Each structure stands twice: as structure tokens, then as C-alpha cells.
Amino acid sequence: VVWRLNAWRTLPAMCVAVGLLMCLPLWQKPRPDEWQVYMLDVGQGLAMVIARNGKAILYDTGLAWPEGDSGQQLIIPWLHWHNLEPEGVILSHEHLDHRGGLDSILHTWPMLWIRSPLNWEHHQPCVRGEAWQWQGLRFSAHWPLQGSNDKGNNHSCVVKIDDGTNSILLTGDIEAPAEQKMLSRYWQQMQATLLQVPHHGSNTSSSLPLIQRVNGKVALASASRYNAWRLPSSKVKHRYQQQGYKWLDTPHQGQITVNFSAQGWRISSLREQILPRWYHQWFGVPVDNG
């Protein structure tokens, strides 16, 4: 293999950039009015962290494989490095690419509370009508309906997190049939600043009515780079962009960070911070993933 000479010239600068980036948690202390949402780069799964005042809540825990899981390999070290103490987990649904890291996380922090729509032992309900406060943020569940015994994607717990000015809607793997049912009754409460794109950007989800009712500014999608399903779908990405959303996804941006404050919100991504030209030269960025 012959590497590009330009890439080698940037290697020292890249090493310095990585070193500085790794030190950021050591000197950056968020202000009390700030809170963060992180979409971690866990591959073909979903794991998000909501953080404020040194505490954290997880929304999904990534995937599992025969030799390990996202909790053990990524989420636990990441939380330790950022000096975040998790207090709870919201599990959208039972599929392994969303709950794969849960056991490892509970082994490290056995006192965590869990909310889910699964009716499993020791799980608090995450169903329509549930609402709670955490660190000054309001969490409200909008799907599934209470008493539903369905499973799978369309039983995903849809949660809105709101600071009174800005908000994010977390959707798990909800698909178009459930989106339609949810919007037919509760569309007035769906508006949010940011939206986690359902089901990794699959065309089975993100119906136009959902995109329009949320009326957000940014769509965030989690998927693996060059995945076999070609997600996120180019049709879905175009659908969001046609409605005025800025589109970001982990296959292209890596970890995505949203910082909310009294001044508004701003987004940064890991690959933008670690010399994107170097990254693109060596690994390439496809025009489209689906």
C-alpha cells in the first residue's frame, strides 16, 4: 500500500490535534446554564448521552457482538474520561443494537435507574404521558401508548428533552406506521429544535408528516460507515434537507456534540476537529451512503 505523501506531511500536526482534543475534558468545565447531548459513534447502533452538571443519562447503549459490546469498549471509558456520572438509562426498545451495552454499564453502575417500554423487571415505564424533571430539564415520553404489548421498532420510546427554550426529540427506531399513530393524536407536542433521525435513517421511517410536525433545525443520524444496509438512505436525507433541516450523521461526522446554553446551541463533530483533510485523504468520504 502506498500512502499519499500529503497525508504523511500532516501526521505531526494530526498527533498534536489529537493530543489537544484528548485533553479538552481536563480543562473545560461547562457553565451551570449549559447542557450537552452527545451522539456517540458506536457503529450500526445508537447510544446518546445527555449531560449536565457532571451527571448523565443514556438514551440507548449501542450494540453487542461475541467478543464484547459498546458499553464495555466505548461508553464506559468515554464517561470516565469526561468525568460524567451516569444516573439512569432510557432504553428505546429491546433490539440488540440499542441495548447491547446495557449489562456492562449496569455491572459498572448497578444503581442506575432504567426507563423503557418493555415491562421488564426493575424498569420504570417509558410510555405516553410519563414526564419527569432531571437537572432542570423536562423529559416527556410521547410513545408508545400505555397498555400496549407490542414489541420492536414501532414500540420505541420517543422522548422529548426540553430546557424551556430548546429541545431534542429522541425517537429510537420508530417507523412510519407508529409515527402516523403518534402524530394523529399528539402532533401539537412534537415540535423540537433537533431530531434524532429514526431507525438509523431507514426509508421505513422519517415520514414527511413527522419531519414537518417536528419542524426542527437539525437532523442527527447514527449508523456505521459503509454499512451493508446503505444507511442513512439518500431519500431520507433529501427529505429532511428539503424541509430546511441541517443533516449530520456519524458515518461522516463521527461523534456529534450539541451544546445548549442561554445563548442558544452549537454543534461540533469529532472528525471536524481532528484534521478533516487528513481523514478524508486516507479514508475517503463517499458522496452518499444510501
Labelled PLM ranges:
Residues 1-290:
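Non-globular, low-confidence helical/coil segments that flank catalytic cores
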